Structure formats: C-alpha cells, structure tokens
C-alpha cells in the first residue's frame, strides 16, 4: 500500500496547477501550428505531436495544423527519376513536379498526420488549400513555375470544423484563377491561414532554438521593429529570414503573436502555450 506521494507526482500536480492561468487564457483560442522537418518521419515524435494537438483540443484550444513535406517530396521525385532544380533555395516546380508534390503532401504526409491524431483519440480531417476554395494563389515567381503565394484565404471550412471539435490538418497547396495547382511554402501557408483566422498564436516549429542575437543567445521576446533592425544589421540571416518574414506579415495582419519554436524539444507546443518561459522566440507587432 502506498502511503505517500512521490516527488514526480507532486511535481506533476504543481505543473498542472501552474498551467491554470494559461489554460484559461487560451480557452477557445485559435492556434495555428506549422509542423514539418524530421519529426514527420519519426513515429515517436509524430505520436508525441499528435498527443499535444489532442490535448489542446481537449482543454478548449482550436488547433490548426499546417504541414510541410520537403524530405518526402525529394524522396519521391528521386524514386520517379525527376530531377529537382532549385533557384535561390526554392524548388522550381514544373507540371510534372507539382503533380508529385500534391501526391506526397495530400496523399501521404497529410493522411499520416491525420491518422496519428485520430489514433490518440482526437478527430482530425485532412485538407489542402484547394478544398472549399481555402487558398487562392498567384504565381510567386514565373521562373519558379507552379510555386504560389496566397492571394486570398477563405477560412469558412476551418470554422465549420471547429464547430464539430475537429482538428484541421492542411497541406500547403492552393489553386490559381484557372484552377491550376500551386505548391506553397509551408510557413507562408500557415501565416496566411493564421491571418485569415485572426489567430491568437502562430507557432512555427523548426530545428533551431529560436531567434538569436549577435552574441548567439536566444531572444525570447521581440517586436516587429526589433526584427527589422536585426535583419538590417545581419544578425538575422540565412534560413531564419523567411521565417521572420512570415512572422512579421502575420503579426502585422491581425495575429496576436508568432512564436518560432524549437520543435526538437519534447512537448514544445505545450511548453510554449502553458508555461511562463515558453519554448522559443515570440514576435509581436
């Protein structure tokens, strides 16, 4: 017979108690999460992410998952003998390539995330930006082919899913004025959807610890002006630039805050939303 609580049990109870103000703050909040990278190929990390999404829904948060799929796309193109060409770090997407992109994103990656969430007791539905006219695109750059930038987002289908406690899982595809399919950068798609929903939070999960200052330390809170200055002086560079561009666009168009989150940290989404110190770099307007 057990006669006393273990330290672990006490720590768990204390953590739950400390989370209460954050649970209250985010009740009925909309949180858009960009999920991608190596975690999508790891069963344990996928299951952990799925549990976090189900928990969010159970405590009254409305999560929206937008995913990438670059590594899987590269693998499939290689199997089919289609050579990938990149221009300034962006994939040139011709007609043959966009068909493969759609097949992988909508048919493989999207459904894997949906299944993972459902397996954890949640209810998820997979969509792409082509469904219900969710994302309308214009060409990002004629030289990139079928790579699009969102020109209009109609979030009504997402709001309908919220009413039935369903977690939307969205592949970053859109359609043009003539019905053509466009591949969209996952961060860009997530930002556009967050803006259309006027989301409380946009979380960009990545494989770095956050935005770093000149000394190499993670900056936990920044304003849009801070980000502009750090880009101008070269402190923010390389792959962090497009992520901060997405963040700035989002917070300047109605999203309350965007957080660049270290997705390698277990339960990073929960840590960011429900603890005092979070798990990344928060950017506000």
From Swiss-Prot:
Recorded catalytic activity of this chain's protein: N-acetyl-L-glutamate + ATP = N-acetyl-L-glutamyl 5-phosphate + ADP
Compartments (UniProt record): Cytoplasm
Transmembrane segments: none
GO molecular function, one term: ATP binding
Positions bearing the site annotation: Transition state stabilizer: 34, 243
Family that this chain belongs to: Belongs to the acetylglutamate kinase family. ArgB subfamily.
Entries under NCBIfam families matching the protein: argB (TIGR00761)
Protein's UniProt name: Acetylglutamate kinase
Gene name of the encoded protein: argB
């Amino acid at each position: 017979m057990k006669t006393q609580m273990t330290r672990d049990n006490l720590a768990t109870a204390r953590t739950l108690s400390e989370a209460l103000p954050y649970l209250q703050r985010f009740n009925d909040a909309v949180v858009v999460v960009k999920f991608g990278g190596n975690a999508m190929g790891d069963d344990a990390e996928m299951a952990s992410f799925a549990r976090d999404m189900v928990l969010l829904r159970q405590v009254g948060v409305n999560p929206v998952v937008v995913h990438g799929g670059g590594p899987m796309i590269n693998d499939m193109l290689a199997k089919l003998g289609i050579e990938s060409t990149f221009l300034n770090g962006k994939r040139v997407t011709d007609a043959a390539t966009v068909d493969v992109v759609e097949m992988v994103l909508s048919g493989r990656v999207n459904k894997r995330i949906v299944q993972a969430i459902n397996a954890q007791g949640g209810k998820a539905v997979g969509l792409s930006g082509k469904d219900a006219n969710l994302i309308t695109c214009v060409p990002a750059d004629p030289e990139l082919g079928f790579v699009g930038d969102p020109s209009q987002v109609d979030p009504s289908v997402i709001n309908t899913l919220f009413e039935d406690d369903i977690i939307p899982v969205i592949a970053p595809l859109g359609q043009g004025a003539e019905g053509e399919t466009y591949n969209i950068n996952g961060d860009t798609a997530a930002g556009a959807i967050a803006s259309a929903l006027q989301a409380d939070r946009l979380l960009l999960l990545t494989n770095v610890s956050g935005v770093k200052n000149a000394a190499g330390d993670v900056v936990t809170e920044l304003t849009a002006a801070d980000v502009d200055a750090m880009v101008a002086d070269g402190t923010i560079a390389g792959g962090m630039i497009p992520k901060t561009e997405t963040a700035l666009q989002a917070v300047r168009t109605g999203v309350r805050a965007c957080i660049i989150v270290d997705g390698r940290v277990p339960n990073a989404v929960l840590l960011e939303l429900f603890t005092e110190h979070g798990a990344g770099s928060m950017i506000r307007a």
